[in-house]
Amino acid sequence: MRVITTIAELRTARAALQGTTGLVPTMGYLHEGHLSLVRRARAENDHVITTIFVNPTQFGPSEDLTRYPRDLPRDLALLEAEKVDLVFAPDVSEMYPPGFGTFIDVGPIAAPLEGAARPGHFRGVATVVCKLFAITSPHRAYFGQKDAQQTLVIRRMTLDLNLPVEIVVCPIVREPDGLAMSSRNVYLNPEERRAATVLFRALRAVQERFAAGERNGDALRAAMRAVIDAEPLARADYVSVADLDDLHELETVTNRALASLAVRIGTTRLIDNCVLEA
C-alpha cells in the first residue's frame, strides 16, 4: 500500500494501475461502515484508492471542523489490512491552493434537509468529490446510504457534468443496537450513546406504521417525531418523508419514499434514514 500526499504523485501512481479502479472517498477516522465500502470496492475492481481528507469547505463556521476526529496512523493500518493500493491523504493547501475559487452548485437536490440545515455543505461536498474524481480517474466510486442526500447530490453532479464514474451506494452499517456507524459517534458520552438509539427507534416506528398501511406523509413524519420527543436528550432538527428522486416532502406515499431525520443528542448532530417500500 502506498500513501501519497500530492496530486502530481497520485496521478503518476494512478497511471501505472492497469484494469479497473474503485475510489472510496473518506474524511478518515474510519469505522466498519467505511471498511464495508472498501471491501465492496476491492471485490468489484482490480485496484482500490481510498482518500482521507477532512474537507473544510463542507463545514459551516459553527460546525465541528477543528474537533472532527482524526487518527491517520490507525486509518492507514486498517486500510493496509484491506489491501488498498493507494491512499491519498493531502493537506488542505494541496486541494485548495491560494487563489482557488471554483465551486459546484448542484441545484435543487441540495436545497432541502441537510442543505437547509447546513448552508454551503453540499457546495463543498460536490466540489471536493469532483476534484477527487478528476485526480483519481476512478471507474467506480463508493458511498454509504447513511448520507442519502449526499449520494443524490453526487449522482446529479456526475450526470450533469458527464463524469465517467459509476456511483455505487452501499447499505448502512449499524451497531448491534441499531445506531448507524458514524465517526461523530465518538463525541457521545455513555448516557448520550444510549439516547442515540432514538434515531433507529424512530425509523423503526415509521417502518411499522408504513407496513401497517399508513400512507399519509404527515402521519408518518409524526410517528418519527413522537419517538424523538419522548427521548429527553434528543432534539429533532428535521424529520422527513420525501420523494426518493428529488426529496420533495410527500403528502401521500404511493410507492417508495425516503424517511430521514437529523437529531441532536447533546451537542452532537446525527443523521439516519431508511427507504419505505410497499
UniProtKB/Swiss-Prot annotation:
It is found in: Cytoplasm. Coiled coil: none annotated. One of its GO terms (molecular function) is pantoate-beta-alanine ligase activity. Homodimer. Keywords: ATP-binding, Cytoplasm, Ligase, Nucleotide-binding, Pantothenate biosynthesis. (R)-pantoate binds at Q58, Q150. It is an enzyme of class 6 (ligase). One of its GO terms (cellular component) is cytosol. NCBIfam families: cyt_tran_rel, panC. The active site is at H34 (proton donor). Belongs to the pantothenate synthetase family. Its EC number is 6.3.2.1. Signal peptide: none annotated. It comes from Roseiflexus sp. (strain RS-1). Pathway: Cofactor biosynthesis; (R)-pantothenate biosynthesis; (R)-pantothenate from (R)-pantoate and beta-alanine: step 1/1. It holds the Pfam family Pantoate_ligase. The keyword Zinc does not apply. This is Pantothenate synthetase. Its main location: cytoplasm. The reaction proceeds by a bi uni uni bi ping pong mechanism. The keyword ATP-binding applies.
